């Protein structure tokens, strides 16, 4: 116990010496020599009683050894007596200067408390008491004698920096904030005369009290800390201590506190780029300019940044500093290494779409995918109306204008505009020279082994969540099985019209079909009053009739020389074309269209005469029977009723002058045939041939024609076939 008390007194003496050394601040400032103004009491330990005068009036708690985030208090207690005006105003209170503490910045590590002592006449025998008894004796002595005669005067040797507040702590623990006018008068510090000194700016503060309780050397100490929350500022807390300030002889500068959780971001004014650092923004701004100050001394190529230049120089020297830890490959840049590991080893896809389940290895591919949701096509061709979602497809499209073919077959040296076309050429034309890798799960044959690995990973890897078919509710855990299942829906006409029997495979076709029922034509021409059901019809109409620069493509039929604006129309015409001299088909037969129409007419006539056919006997079996009487009644003015022809549909490529005109009426005759068994009379219409030059003589009967005249091409007409069937 005695040893602990002695150690406590020795520590208090050492801290008192440190406080006295700061007293020489003003003298060194004025150039004077340092002189000690007080003598430390000597500790005498003679083995018996050890008596020491302890000046243990604690006036201030200095937090010198606290965490660097706390500002330190800098005060100095000087010996002397209080002025008569101040003696009357001092009561049982203590004036303490406290600092601003931001408790939310980071955890606080409470260090040692340094005690600055002022001599008070209290004598305690150290050998027979403890620290607790020492504190009790001090309180009793203070209550008896008071502090009127020996009250120390607190003199701030430094101006209160920003974040400090002076409070008055009463005997019972009351805390009162002192305003500037209530403080004792102080002389102007000498350092304010320094031309380099700048007083700190004052800012509004909010007071918040919090208590810290900690244990130091077995003693519980309750410290009240006042947290003055300032407005949001930038910067970090500077580590300031009393020794550094005294040595530099300059007051501390106000610190800027950055609150936790608030991140400062910088945004580009020309695009939506954001970054957390100013240096990143400056580097990004160079991408909006054509400035390339860093030039390669080997090839003359220039770059925006030094990093890009270094990576380029590695391509000249062959240096690949970034090596893959999973394989033997090395890369020029760290970005290439990261991309390689994600594609080949980790298969990580950190960039995910917020609208669907798509995920990508590269952020550029994610941006391109998002444009498929928004429909944005920012990359426009300068020579035509083509627009693309990414620059790669635009470059590939520009080759159609320039005629460039950068991809060459290594076998036959044929050149292509796209790499995919070249690969397909090699697989189709040079299969004997290409190594084939068969997929063990399906019939796919792949030329390269790396492509086989990609195929296995994408098509046959197990999917935990499973993917649902877009056409039905089936769920599959393998992409290949899902694709094969969806192919079964390919020819299925899932969309059916509710007003007719029309069905189709795609929804857009059903939408266009329903417009035939509603009569809706939403696409109107801006140059005339015509409207259309489809946009492509509107575009075609505009090009043909309103575009002065439009030159229609001419597709010429090789048989008759007709021209068409569409290839499929010309191909359909060529199948039925017989050449410029006739209307027969390619082999001299009838055209497909005429055959189809003739079959339809024959079918309708068969249905009309089905009843009479069932009632007629087989005339071929009754060879011995006599033929029925035949009467010919020529019609003076035959006017057969012919159905009105349907409106001619205007087709592209057909000359406007040619329309479907009905054939001229030929003289006909009606033959009445009476059946002897049933008595039924049937009328048969036959054509009568008349010679234009020779007229029949009087009294001479015209010979009935039991069958119609032959067709111009030598084939039987429907009337001839019906008459033969009746006989």
From Swiss-Prot:
GO terms for cellular component: chromosome, centromeric region; condensed chromosome; male germ cell nucleus; nucleolus; nucleoplasm; nucleus. Residues 610-636, 694-704 have a biased composition (Acidic residues). There is a cross-link at residue 74 (Glycyl lysine isopeptide (Lys-Gly) (interchain with G-Cter in SUMO)). Changing residue 448 to Q: In a Wilms' tumor. Changing residue 345 to R: In a prostate tumor. Residues 658-677 have a biased composition (Polar residues). The keyword Transcription regulation applies. The modification N-acetylmethionine is found at residue 1. Interacts with CHD8. Interacts with LLPH. Interacts with CENPE. Interacts with BRD2; promoting BRD2 recruitment to chromatin. It is linked to Intellectual developmental disorder, autosomal dominant 21: A disorder characterized by significantly below average general intellectual functioning associated with impairments in adaptive behavior and manifested during the developmental period. Additional MRD21 features include short stature, microcephaly, and developmental delay. This is Transcriptional repressor CTCF. The lineage of its organism: Eukaryota, Metazoa, Chordata, Craniata, Vertebrata. The gene is CTCF.
């Amino acid at each position: 116990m005695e040893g602990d008390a002695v150690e406590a007194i020795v520590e208090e003496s050492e801290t008192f010496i440190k406080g006295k050394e700061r007293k020489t601040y003003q003298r060194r400032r004025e150039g004077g020599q340092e002189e000690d103004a007080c003598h430390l009491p000597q500790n005498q330990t003679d083995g018996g009683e050890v008596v020491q005068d302890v000046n243990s009036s604690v006036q201030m708690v200095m937090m010198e050894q606290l965490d660097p985030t706390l500002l330190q208090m800098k005060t100095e207690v000087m010996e002397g007596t209080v002025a008569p005006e101040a003696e009357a105003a001092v009561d049982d209170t203590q004036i303490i200067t406290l600092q601003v503490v931001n408790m939310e910045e980071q955890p606080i590590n409470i260090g040692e408390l340094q005690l600055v002592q002022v001599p008070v006449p209290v004598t305690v025998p150290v050998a027979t008491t403890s620290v607790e008894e020492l504190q009790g004796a001090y309180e009793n002595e203070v209550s008896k004698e008071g502090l009127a005669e020996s009250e120390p005067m607190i003199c701030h040797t430094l101006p209160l920096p920003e974040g400090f507040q002076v409070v008055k702590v009463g005997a019972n623990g009351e805390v009162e904030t002192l305003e500037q006018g209530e403080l004792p008068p102080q002389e102007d510090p000498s350092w304010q005369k320094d031309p380099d000194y700048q007083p700190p700016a004052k800012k509004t503060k909010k007071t918040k009290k919090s208590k810290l309780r900690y244990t130091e050397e077995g003693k519980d100490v309750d410290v009240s800390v006042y947290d003055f929350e300032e407005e949001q500022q930038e910067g970090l807390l500077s580590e300031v201590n009393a020794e550094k300030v005294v040595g530099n002889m300059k007051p501390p500068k106000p610190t800027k506190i950055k609150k936790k959780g608030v991140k400062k971001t910088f945004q580009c004014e020309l695009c939506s780029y954001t970054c957390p650092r100013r240096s990143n923004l400056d580097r990004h701004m160079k991408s909006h300019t054509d400035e390339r100050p860093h030039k390669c001394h080997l090839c003359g190529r220039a770059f925006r940044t030094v990093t890009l230049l270094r990576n380029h120089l590695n391509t000249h020297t062959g240096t690949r500093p970034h090596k893959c830890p999973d394989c033997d490959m090395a890369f020029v840049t760290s970005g290439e290494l990261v991309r390689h590991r994600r594609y080949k080893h980790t298969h990580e896809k950190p960039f995910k779409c917020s609208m669907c389940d798509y995920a990508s290895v590269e952020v550029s591919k994610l941006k391109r995918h998002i444009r498929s949701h928004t429909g944005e096509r920012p990359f426009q061709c300068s020579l035509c109306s083509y627009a693309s979602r990414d620059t790669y497809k635009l470059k590939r499209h520009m080759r159609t204008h320039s005629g460039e073919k950068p991809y060459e077959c290594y076998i036959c040296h044929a050149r292509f505009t796209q790499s995919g076309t070249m690969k397909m050429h090699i697989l189709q034309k040079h299969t004997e020279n290409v190594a084939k890798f068969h997929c063990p799960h399906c019939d796919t044959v792949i030329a390269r082994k790396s492509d086989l690995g990609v195929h296995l990973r994408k098509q046959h890897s197990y999917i935990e969540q499973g993917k649902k078919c877009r056409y039905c509710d089936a769920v599959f855990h393998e992409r290949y099985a899902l694709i094969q299942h969806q192919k079964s829906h390919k020819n299925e006409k899932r969309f059916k019209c509710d007003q007719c029997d029309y069905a189709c495979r795609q929804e857009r076709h059903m939408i266009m079909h329903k417009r035939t029922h509603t009569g809706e034509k939403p696409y109107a021409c801006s140059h005339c009053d015509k409207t259309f059901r489809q946009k492509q019809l509107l575009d075609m109409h505009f090009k043909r009739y309103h575009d002065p620069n439009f030159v229609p493509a001419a597709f010429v039929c090789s048989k008759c020389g007709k021209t068409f604006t569409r290839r499929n129309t010309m191909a359909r015409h060529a199948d039925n074309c017989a050449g410029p001299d006739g209307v027969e088909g390619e082999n001299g037969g009838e055209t497909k269209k005429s055959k189809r129409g003739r079959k339809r007419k024959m079918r309708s006539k068969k249905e009309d005469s089905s009843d009479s056919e069932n009632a007629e006997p087989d005339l071929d079996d009754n060879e011995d029977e006599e033929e029925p009487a035949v009467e010919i009644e020529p019609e003076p003015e035959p006017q057969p009723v012919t159905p009105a022809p349907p409106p001619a549909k205007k087709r592209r490529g057909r000359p406007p002058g040619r329309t479907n005109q009905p054939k001229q009426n030929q003289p006909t005759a009606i033959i009445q045939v009476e059946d002897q068994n049933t008595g039924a009379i049937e009328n048969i219409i036959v054509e009568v041939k008349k010679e234009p030059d020779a007229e029949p003589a009087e009294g001479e009967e015209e010979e009935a024609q039991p069958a119609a005249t032959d067709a111009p091409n030598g084939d039987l007409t429907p009337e001839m076939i019906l008459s033969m069937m009746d006989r």
